[in-house]
A protein has these predicted regions:
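Membrane-embedded hydrophobic alpha-helical segments
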Residues: 1-31
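Long, hydrophobic alpha-helical segments that serve as membrane-spanning/inserting helices
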Residues: 23, 27-232
Length: 232
């Protein structure tokens, strides 16, 4: 009877030991997963900082291109009477300015593919991250349209301007072209420039909106990270 009772007690002891060990293992695993999630979110926040710098540059570049086209459209009737270096600069900005947005989606994909995204408590963070990277593909398509428009216009620029020096502006674009044309900008070229301006403006507005959303996303990520008791 005593032996039977001892066996039962030992079995119960082993069960308790196993249960506690299993609980601690699961808890440690859960803590580890939470740590990985937070590391990914921190990296995404750092990527956001880099993206914000790139997008602010892009917004300035596309604003400059749009303003150059507006100037050419407004002054085309009097183009031959204006300073050749000014006209050449505006044509160069109108035709050549384009951007290529390069983002880093590695952390987002890792968070998504590992299932760690399910550990994010704030649903707003999940939705904001997903919407951000979806929108990037759209921006790249707009940029491709602008590059293609510029490629179509380059023959006119090369035929009617000459690069006198290789000085760059504050954004890194050439500002040394001088107008050598003998006529105002032909209407087909002017109309294509107007189309290009519309795309620049559309892109610039989308980027400004993305800048606001990325700043808000950084704040949301900060709130999510503050929920981790290990960080408080």
């Amino acid at each position: 009877m005593f032996t039977h009772r001892l066996d039962v007690q030992l079995s119960y002891y082993h069960f308790r030991t196993f249960s506690i060990s299993f609980y601690l293992e699961r808890k440690n695993d859960s803590d580890y997963q939470e740590e990985l999630k937070n590391q990914s979110l921190n990296r995404i926040s750092n990527n956001l900082t880099m993206d914000l710098g790139d997008m602010e540059f892009n917004a300035k570049a596309h604003t400059k291109a749009s303003e150059a086209i507006a100037w050419l459209v407004k002054n085309n009737h009097n183009l031959l009477n204006l300073p050749k270096d000014t006209v050449g600069l505006k044509i160069s900005q109108a035709v050549s300015i384009a951007t290529i947005f390069v983002d880093n989606q590695e952390e987002y994909r890792a968070l998504q593919n590992s299932g760690l995204i399910e550990l994010i408590e704030l649903e707003e963070v999940v939705l904001a991250i997903q919407n951000k990277y979806k929108s990037h593909d759209f921006y790249k398509k707009i940029e491709d349209m602008i590059v293609n428009q510029g490629s179509e216009l380059r023959p006119y620029m090369y035929q009617n301007t000459q690069l006198k020096h290789e000085q760059l502006d504050e954004l890194g674009f050439h500002e040394g072209r001088v107008f050598t044309g003998t006529e105002p900008i032909p209407n087909p070229i002017l109309e294509r420039l107007k189309d290009k301006k519309w795309i620049h403006d559309f892109y610039q507005n989308r980027i400004q909106d993305r800048i606001k959303k990325d700043r808000a996303l950084q704040e949301l990520i900060h709130k999510e990270l503050q929920k981790d008791p290990h960080l408080n």
